[in-house]
Amino acid sequence: MSYSLLSAVGSGGLVGFMLGLLGGGGSMLATPLLLYAVGVAQPHVAIGTGALAVSVNAFANFASHAIKGHVWWRCALVFSGLGVVGALLGSSLGKAFDGERLIFLFGLLMVVVGALMLKPRKAVAAKPAVGTFGLATALNYASSGLVDWVLAAEFIGGGVVGGVFGMLLATRLGAYKNVLNRLFAALIFTVAAYILYRSWGAFLPA
């Protein structure tokens, strides 16, 4: 088994696990994992591939939570519907942006997401939103040939397995949700710092 396959499946497993355990924030790890762990050379391909994989994993994990009654449906439907427009506009703008600069801005966004993770959240409305936004973004990138379909399949395979374990653990650690969110926020801040360190040079004059 090749390193690229192991890294793709392992990275997908980590993202799926976080989605199953926490509900949404884990999707932020997909792009940096594809870039720095799997070794995808083009930032736009990493974003498009990660968006596709995360959307599939998010919908898969969401189904289990919906069956258990953990979904705040009104919020989920409104948030997902309105967010599609933003996802399409944002991904169209992102495709026109320099890849390295886009990754730097992504690092800044991760800081914001990390801060939001510190706040208590209600029932799971994140997963259908993550899935819908991700699918809209992925289709937009795919239309420009910016999705690695084989890599996405490997990532999704790992994500399905990781999501199962994440959901099983979530039922046992439900009382510690806020603690888990804070720990994950610390991870998000760490990854964001690494991304900003690696990509800040994109804004330096040539």
State what each model feature region is.
Residues M1-M18, T31-P43, A63-P128, A142-A206:
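Juxtamembrane transmembrane-helix boundary motif
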Residues M1-S2, G20-L29, I47-A58, A129-L139:
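Hydrophobic alpha-helical transmembrane segments
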